[in-house]
């Protein structure tokens, strides 16, 4: 399995607090059968904004531990979308996913659909492929025809493993089930934040999706597509 969205990098957002915790999170990932991870620290104006130099320094410190466990580790960003998004990526202020053409975009719960659509289109025109993070959280996307419209534009749709499993609540489980049934999920990721709360549940989720929606689909959204993202295909 490959996890393209997690907060395993320590000391840069609301995820891992220390190198030790990050190493524990890597061990949990290994037990889940994860072979590749894209670290996606938050970048959000006025809330999470750490110098790239610090992010890259912590990444380098973590690398030997990942190598030892046989996990490929790449850098990315979970970018909370603002109007200067293209400048931020073009200007190298944050990492695309594994330094490919893919970017992980996040919105506010109350974002207007017109804004989500506009910024997704802007990213695509600029040469990026937006992966829209945890779509189940946005009120404006409760109508799944809007998910189809975003996919037609060229975006990929990501949901969280914990939402699929019902850990994040029944509402999210119902919504993600509807998306999975319609074949509208492109990627499932852990969005894990620690070792005690919001832990990685990718293995359990893979088994659930395979049982309910078929092995082929589980493989596509938790192995094949994430692998294409990490390799920039």
Residues covered by each model-derived region:
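Metallo-beta-lactamase
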Residues: 7-16, 145-151, 159-162
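Short acidic/histidine-rich active-site segments
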Residues: 184-199
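Non-catalytic positions within long, well-ordered alpha-helices that form the structural scaffold/packing
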Residues: 30, 124, 180-181
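Mid-to-C-terminal alpha-helical segments outside catalytic/metal-binding sites
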Residues: 202, 206-233
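Active-site beta-loop-alpha junctions enriched in small/polar residues
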Residues: 7-9, 42-43, 76-82, 108-110, ...
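An N-terminally biased module of ancient metal coordination in phosphate/nucleic-acid-related enzymes
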Residues: 1-70
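Extended substrate/RNA-proximal surfaces in nucleic-acid metabolism proteins
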Residues: 49-158
